Design a protein with these regions (language model features):
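Non-catalytic DNA-recognition/assembly elements of restriction-modification systems
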Residues: 1-58, 187-267
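Short, positively charged
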Residues: 145-174
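Short, surface-exposed loop/turn microsegments at beta-strand edges and helix-strand junctions
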Residues: 61-69, 78-81, 85-87, 99-101, ...
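Short hydrophobic-aromatic micro-motifs
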Residues: 70-73, 101, 106-109
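A short beta-sheet element
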Residues: 97, 108-150
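Short, contiguous, well-structured surface segments enriched in hydrophobic/aromatic residues
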Residues: 44, 68-71
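Sequence-specific dsDNA recognition surfaces
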Residues: 41-60, 75-103
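A short glycine-rich beta-alpha junction/loop motif
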Residues: 126-134, 166-192
Length: 267
């Protein structure tokens, strides 16, 4: 059970609402916390950052990167490894050039699971992402991009992304909604400290991605494994959870990229 104490100052500005579900909602509580921060508040719109959402388009996929550009769904942006193996036809690249991600952008999932925030590093460059993703191109003139990302990914930013100012749940986020989010205009020294930490984390993520790729190459080299093709993925589909567990022994010569999973050897 949740309890709280309110006064007339909380009731009068909110159309005389007295219901507990309103005053105890996270959006209202965190909103009060932000109001009490002793610094000027600024909306994302007033930071002069570019916020936009792509137009719906029909996707034409191709087999490899020779004929396509790496494609990311909204759920892919939060993965440690964004090499999904999906490529959008280069024939679409001109009309969809504005959807190609660049370094130091902020992207936000805006439907389904909404409010997941990602700061793009160099590994995201030259990837086309779904139209259903809010893109923020930060402007450091008033708010440093690292601080903006840190705020949006905090509970104070997440709450504004996923709930209305009256505490209602938001089912879909649009650019106007994001532009209306407010954040404290902290001193430049503090913003720089936060920005430095976010930039460092982005750099470390790049190193982690490179290390993961190197490890994969080493494994394939020493185990004499080849890369999986699209046909391999189609042939060796997901296992059935109703299948009984079994143990067996296989010779090293029987192992390759398509059979390294134990399920593919089971009978």
């Amino acid at each position: 059970m949740k309890t709280s104490v309110i006064n007339t100052k909380s009731i009068l500005p909110n159309s005389f609402r007295f219901d507990p579900s309103f005053h105890l909602s996270e959006a209202i509580i965190l909103g009060k916390d932000l109001d009490n921060v002793p610094y000027e508040k600024i909306s994302i719109k007033d930071t002069n950052s570019k916020v936009f959402l792509g137009n719906i388009f029909s996707r034409i996929f191709v087999k490899d990167k020779e004929h396509g550009i790496p494609y990311l769904a909204a759920s892919d942006t939060v993965l440690a490894d964004i090499n999904t193996g999906r490529f959008l036809s280069k024939k679409q690249s001109k009309e969809l050039a504005y959807l190609i991600l660049k370094k130091d952008w902020i992207v936000i999932t805006c439907s389904g699971t909404i409010g997941n925030v990602t700061y793009t590093n160099s590994t995201f460059e030259n990837h086309i992402a779904t139209h259903d993703l809010i893109r923020i191109v930060p402007n450091d003139e008033k708010i440093l991009k690292g601080y903006l990302y840190a705020f949006l990914s905090s509970k104070y930013g997440y709450c504004q992304l996923t709930q209305s100012r009256f505490g209602g749940v938001v089912k879909h986020i649009n650019a106007d909604h994001v532009n209306g989010i407010t954040l404290p205009l902290f001193p430049e020294s503090f913003q720089m400290e936060v920005d430095d930490l976010i930039q460092e984390s982005a750099r470390l993520r790049e190193e982690a991605t490179e290390a993961l790729e190197d490890a994969s190459k080493l494994l394939k080299h020493y185990a004499s494994l080849s890369d999986l093709t699209e046909a391999d993925y189609d042939y060796y589909g997901p296992r059935s959870y109703e299948r009984q567990v079994s143990c067996f022994v296989k010779s090293r010569k029987d192992i390759d990229s398509t059979t390294i999973n134990a399920f593919n050897h089971s009978e």
